[in-house]
Every structure is written in structure tokens, then in C-alpha cells.
Amino acid sequence: MRLIGLLNYIYTLKMKTLTLLFSLFLMCPLSVWGQSADELLSKVSDALSEGKDDYAVSLFRQAANAGEDRTEMFYWTNVDKSSEVAPRLADVLAVHYKEMRNYDKAYLFYKEFLQRHPEDVPALVSCAEMEMMRGKEKDALKTYEKVLMLDADNLQANIFLGNYYYLQAEKDKKKLEEDYKKITSPTRMQYARYRNGLSDVFTNSYGKAKAYLQRVLQVFPSMEAG
């Protein structure tokens, strides 16, 4: 009986070990199990030459995880930029670099993708995000405006533009008030300029902010409660 119990214990332990190893295998990318970026990229070349674009993209994604520098070099030197698969490979690198928080490189490859698909809204939104992360607020503003030309209900673009114009209005209003307070005895003309300046701020910046944020609440009314 003890022998049977021992055998059952060993069998259970072995099964748990096999289950753990299988789980680790599923969790780890193929490159972890010994394939270098160069090996994977060689397979990418073969897949591309055989017209297996989906498989090539999958391998290319693994190669980026195994060695982003080698994979990027492969893109610049070995990929036909006029091919249908080229923007898909650029998108792989854009997403990879975004996840790695290399915003300059991510921006570069989103722009590369957008050369072929200039009206792709998700890519434009991601590009605008990278512009913000790179401190290019004005560029992000223009990109989000383009997004709304293609998708007027885009949540992220409406929120960004609403907040942008609201903060701009607050900044302009504060400057007008501070400058006016510096005048000891304002004339009627100076007062009129001050009032006209405030009117412009409320009409333009505050007005734009209100329009964008109201759009958010119209499309996503649940956000009002939040």
C-alpha cells in the first residue's frame, strides 16, 4: 500500500511539473526558447518570399521582442516599402516601441505607417499620443483635429481638444487679468481693451472647449455622472 501511495505521489508530482512547464511554454514567446532575432528574421524573409504575409508579420513581431535593433535594421534594408505588408511591419515596430516607451521611435514608425494609410484613425490617435509624449503639443493638436475630420465622435480627440482649449482659455484669461491689475488708474480705452480681450477668450477658447466637451457628453453620456 505504501508503494502504491508513493507511486501515486510521484505521478501527481510529475503531472504538476508537466503542467507548469506547459504553462510557461505558452506564456513565453518563441524567441525565448532559443531563436535569435536573426534566425526569426531569416524566417520572415522566407515567409515574405512565399507570400505568407500573416506568418511573416507574426515572426516579425517575435523578432522585435528578441532584438529590436536588428529587426528595425531588417525593416529599413530588406522590406519592400511598396509592398502591401510593409505598413503592417511598420505598425509592429510602432506598437513595440510604444510599449517600450521609446516614443521617438514609436512616432517614427507610426508616421511610416501613415504614409500608406493617412486616414487610419487608430494610427492617427496613437501618433498624436506620441507627439504629446515627445512634447510636441501643437503637432498633437493638428493630428487630433485631423482625427475629428475623419471621426467626429472620437472620444480621445474630443477630450484632448476640449481640455487643450480650456487650459488655453484659463491661461489667456489669467494674463489679461494680471496685466489689467498692473494698471493703477485704467482709462476707459484700457478698460475697453480688457473687456474685449475677455470677450475674445470666452468666445473663442472657452467656446471651443465647451463644444468639444459637450460632444463628449452627447456621445458618452455616462461620463457626465463620473
Which role does the model predict for each range below?
Residues 73-87, 167-212:
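Short coil/linker segments at helix-helix boundaries
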Residues 72-74, 89, 123, 157, ...:
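TPR alpha-solenoid repeat register
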Residues 76-78, 88-92, 126, 160:
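Canonical tetratricopeptide repeat
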Residues 32-88:
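N-terminal leader/linker segments that initiate helical-solenoid repeat arrays
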Residues 65, 112-115, 146-149, 211, ...:
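Conserved structural position within tetratricopeptide repeats
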